[in-house]
Amino acid sequence: MTVLPASIRIEPHGRLAPALLPRVFALVDDATDTDGVQPLSEHVVLHLRYGGDERGCNLLLWVDDDEPRLAGYAHLDATDPVEAPSAELVIAPDFRGRGLGTMLVEAILARTGGRLRLWAHGELPAAQAMARRLGFARRRVLLQMRRDLFAPLPPVTLPDDVQIRTFRPGADDDAWIALNARAFADHPEQGSWTLEDLHRRMQESWFDPDGFFLAERDGELVGFHWTKVHGSPAGQASNGSSGHGHEPLGEVYILGVDPKAQGLGLGRALTIVGLRYLRSRRLPHVMLYVDATNAPAIRLYESLGFRHWGTDVLFERGGTANGEGTS
């Protein structure tokens, strides 16, 4: 393991003190502006809004020059009882090229016994090289796809016994959590959401029930499309940090269909309904994330005009890594 120079220190924290949060978010914003991609997932950013998950660990890397400067941040989640702990990290652009990312990952590995899953958002060359150098293998690949919302959209076709309506906060919460669990039974990161996870997102400034669509059959929820808008026309903050630094962008945030309603074309219909809504908001483009191994979903999105835009990679060391795209 690399011995840290005297001018560099790595501090582990549980919840972060409120005074530290602006410094972390400023670092994240700086990296986002430089790289053109968010270095942290929404899950981590949401927890940071509240000081971090008390079950997780936040590591701060400081460089002590004339005064302490925050040069790196990492979030470590070791709560999964089966999988290796997972981490996400970011190094301030002004401090890159000094091996600080390697130091931060090695500090995390020392806490996890050498087992770790590590997300690299945007597939940046430096992150890829560091992962290979430290003995990580690709475990999963997420594709970001985008579409021009000004391009024509096909009509919505639904079975006669299915209706689409919008989400009713409070009234639909429990039923949606149950549907989400059924729809993502094979994807525990999404399917294990609790009411707290739902309510935390409902408290975000971007939450809009008018863009949260539910498919209902015989009084039962059988599918949904939750849309999201990144940024705002006024350039105001819509996440835990500052503005996004780009024009507003729509997202197919979560799309799910009850397994017993598969084959009815609900995924396609719900996608089109959401895209029409985002276009009504005068948004020029829409994005989504999809697992690289989910061929049916990729075919659906490509048939609706989406094209590959970027890639996020989950690396693993000391686990069961077996190639790309394990879901």
From Swiss-Prot:
Catalytic reaction(s) noted: 1D-myo-inositol 2-(L-cysteinylamino)-2-deoxy-alpha-D-glucopyranoside + acetyl-CoA = mycothiol + CoA + H(+)
Record: residues binding 1D-myo-inositol 2-(L-cysteinylamino)-2-deoxy-alpha-D-glucopyranoside: 42, 189, 228, 251, 289
Top-rank lineage group of the source organism: Bacteria
Keywords: Acyltransferase, Repeat, Transferase
Annotated Pfam families: Acetyltransf_1
EC number, as in UniProt: 2.3.1.189
InterPro entries: Acyl_CoA_acyltransferase (IPR016181), Bact_Acetyltransf (IPR050832), GNAT_dom (IPR000182), Mycothiol_AcTrfase (IPR017813)
Biological process annotations from GO: mycothiol biosynthetic process
Binding site for acetyl-CoA 1: 89-91
Single GO MF descriptor: mycothiol synthase activity
Stretches assigned to the N-acetyltransferase domain: 11-159, 162-327
Binding site residues for acetyl-CoA 2: 255-257, 262-268, 294-299
Subunit structure: Monomer.
Family classification: Belongs to the acetyltransferase family. MshD subfamily.
Role of this protein: Catalyzes the transfer of acetyl from acetyl-CoA to desacetylmycothiol (Cys-GlcN-Ins) to form mycothiol.
Protein name per Swiss-Prot or TrEMBL: Mycothiol acetyltransferase
Gene: mshD
